[in-house]
Amino acid sequence: ETAAAAGDTAGVGQIWVDDAVPNTLMFTNDVGTDIQLASTLEVTAAKVTQGTKVASTSGTAINFTGVPAGTKRVTLSMQGVSTDGTSNHRILIGDSGGLETSGYLGAQALVSSGGYSSSTGNISDGMRITITQAADTSNGTVVLNLIDASTNTWGMLVISGQTTNQLTLSASSKSLSAALDRITYTTVNGSDVFDAGMISIQYEI
């Protein structure tokens, strides 16, 4: 904070905080004219909470419940996540009424090092990660961003590299009936068993 801008310099403007009126942001142009930009300036950093890391080494689903109220972004990070089968991995979200298995608006693309690529549109049953063989492991990130709190609408993005030299990109959106409070990482067939890896979760409020 200061009482005034520093000495005028031709062609140079200055941004400063006025100490006579605390938290008032000022701009002084190159001819010395003071312009108030904002008063009661406050900067609030997002609160990031690191959830518990979960081993994806058993069961048919990895469940994360108790998403904090007011959460605006959720990040899942996967390392070496594998199952004993070849069903595509699937991410589902839900609220107090349970998980949602339909109504997603999404698409998916697969790119491999051999030059093969494919895409699938109108995916309505969740976010998918392509699996082509049981040896595939998923490594990457799932990001969920709150689009509209009034309709509990979320935008979702998946980037996952598989150890069989392929990359999955998936994007979707989904509206819930109530606030998001649960996320599940599972498979499309729901019966393949997880046998390796781990998943962590972060919340931003």
Q: Which stretches of residues belong to each language-model region?
A:
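Beta-strand repeat scaffolds of extracellular/surface proteins
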Residues: 1-4, 30, 79
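N-terminal cationic amphipathic segment used for targeting or macromolecule association
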Residues: 1-4, 8, 36, 43-44, ...
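Extracellular/surface-exposed low-complexity repeats and stalk/linker segments enriched in Gly/Pro
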Residues: 1-17, 22
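Residues in flexible loops and secondary-structure boundaries
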Residues: 5-7, 23-25, 33-35, 61-62, ...
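Surface-exposed molecular-recognition determinants
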Residues: 14, 40-205
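Short, surface-exposed terminal/edge motifs of secreted or surface/virion proteins that either
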Residues: 17-42
